[in-house]
């Protein structure tokens, strides 16, 4: 059996729509094995997803088909599922990356992360979640001719934590995409380009006092925020309680606050605020995962 662990991810990072992503230290773990009996065998997977349309199986089959690898049956087990589903934290990317890595391992082939990225983008459609899930850390990504993904890892200074403010409801990527405008004003493009460049420099040199301005966005957040109850109140309170910045994680509905890693009051203050307002959201204090997806050995 092959065990694979994949981190959560937060994409967009304010102005970096479909281009910036970061890996975070909550994980899903998966186990894969070949079976002598023909068929698909699932464990830890909801019944409605126990079929050939399962995204994990689709990723595995993509690799097997590419290399003409023949198999009778396959076992897919979710050992641990700590990444919340449809919350803007890369749960689907985790499944895709795990399936691809698991497939290479089952074939006994070397894990080529560049190839895994290309295959993952063919499935996902964009690289900003799958790329940090594969490589870890903070990455800047683009698509060349809508086919080939290019990426560069961004060095960052320590000193910050990421606080995921996770609503108790799901928001599908399809619904979140549907509210976006078909065209964006030129001035809004300039607004985001400048802040995306500033954001990368803030992470690189540790000038986190500029993050509040550097994570602002005019391309997607104001449209998607209308789908999220309590968005404005939670966003404003996070800044009031001392966060460097707050932004929508991925397509939402999770909001991500960045705080000083020495700040011991933010989570306490926010927890009390949520309780007082009866806002039933989860709060997770996270750090950057620097390693990305990996095969677990000897566990």
Regions found by a protein language model. Name each.
Residues 1-87, 105, 109-111, 290-291, ...:
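ATP-binding N-lobe of GHMP and related small-molecule kinases
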Residues 10-12, 21-24, 68-70, 88, ...:
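Solvent-exposed alpha-helices and their adjacent loops that cap or buttress functional pockets
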Residues 26, 89-113, 134-139:
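DPxDG-like acidic metal-binding loop motif
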Residues 34, 143, 167, 257-261:
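Short beta-strand-to-loop capping motifs
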Residues 38-41, 173, 262-269:
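Short, conserved charged micro-motifs
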Residues 113-158, 246, 252:
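Alpha/beta catalytic cores of group-transfer enzymes, especially the acyltransferase/condensing modules
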Residues 166-226:
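Active-site rim beta-loop-alpha module in soluble metabolic enzymes
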Residues 203-299:
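Glycine-rich, charge-dense phosphate/pyrophosphate-binding loop(s)
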């Amino acid at each position: 059996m092959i065990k694979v662990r994949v981190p959560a991810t937060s994409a967009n990072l304010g102005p970096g729509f479909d281009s910036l992503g970061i890996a975070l230290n909550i994980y899903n773990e998966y186990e894969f094995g070949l079976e002598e009996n023909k068929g698909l065998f699932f464990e830890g997977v909801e019944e409605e997803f126990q079929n050939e349309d399962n995204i994990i199986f689709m990723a595995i089959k993509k690799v097997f088909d590419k290399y003409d690898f023949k198999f009778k049956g396959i076992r897919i087990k979710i050992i641990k599922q700590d990444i919340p589903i449809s919350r803007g934290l890369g749960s689907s990317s985790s499944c895709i990356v795990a399936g691809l890595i698991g497939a290479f391992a089952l074939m006994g082939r070397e894990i080529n992360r560049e190839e895994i990225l290309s295959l993952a983008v063919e499935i996902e459609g964009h690289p900003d979640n799958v790329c940090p899930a594969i490589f870890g850390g903070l990455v800047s990504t683009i698509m060349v001719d809508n086919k080939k993904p290019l990426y560069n890892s961004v060095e960052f200074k320590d000193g910050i934590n990421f606080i995921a403010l996770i609503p108790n409801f799901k928001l599908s990527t399809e619904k979140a995409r549907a509210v976006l405008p078909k065209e964006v004003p030129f001035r809004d493009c300039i607004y985001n380009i400048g802040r995306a460049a500033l954001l990368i420099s803030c992470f690189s040199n540790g000038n986190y006092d500029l993050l509040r301005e550097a994570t602002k966005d005019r391309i997607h957040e104001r449209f998607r925020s209308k789908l999220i109850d309590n968005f404005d109140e939670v966003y404003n309170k996070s800044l009031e309680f001392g966060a460097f910045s707050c932004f929508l994680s991925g397509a939402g509905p999770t909001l991500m606050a960045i705080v000083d890693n020495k700040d011991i009051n933010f989570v306490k203050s926010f927890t009390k605020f949520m309780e007082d307002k009866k806002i039933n959201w989860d709060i997770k204090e996270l750090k950057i995962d620097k390693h990305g997806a990996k095969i677990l050995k000897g566990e």
